[in-house]
Curated annotation (Swiss-Prot):
Organism field: Psidium guajava (Guava)
UniProt region (Disordered), positions on chain: 18-55
GO BP: defense response to bacterium
Compositionally skewed regions (Gly residues) per UniProt: 18-39
Its job: Has antibacterial activity against the Gram-negative bacteria Klebsiella sp., Proteus sp., E.coli ATCC 8739 (MIC=72 ug/ml) and K.pneumoniae (MIC=32 ug/ml). Has no activity against the Gram-negative bacterium S.typhimurium or the Gram-positive bacterium S.aureus. Does not have antifungal activity against the human and plant pathogenic fungi F.oxysporum, A.fumigatus and R.solani.
Disulfide bonds: none
Entry keyword set: Antibiotic, Antimicrobial
Subunit structure: Monomer and homodimer. Might act by homodimer formation.
Biased composition range(s): Basic and acidic residues: 44-55
Domain of life: Eukaryota
Protein's UniProt name: Glycine-rich antimicrobial peptide Pg-AMP
Length: 55
């Protein structure tokens, strides 16, 4: 299910927004980066939500 292209998309987004981790802080809510934005800020969740959620 996790294709390399989709994973690269996540990393690209993270790099674009300046956050490290999956999907960036804005889309991922910070559950991938932890250093970008605090968790709970991820109101704008992308389709990567269910894929990148560790919990």
């Amino acid at each position: 299910r996790e294709s390399p292209s989709s994973r690269m998309e996540c990393y690209e987004q993270a790099e674009r927004y300046g956050y490290g981790g999956y999907g960036g802080g804005r889309y991922g809510g910070g559950y991938g980066s932890g250093r970008g934005q605090p968790v709970g800020q991820g109101v704008e969740r992308s389709h990567d939500d269910n894929r990148n959620q560790p919990r």
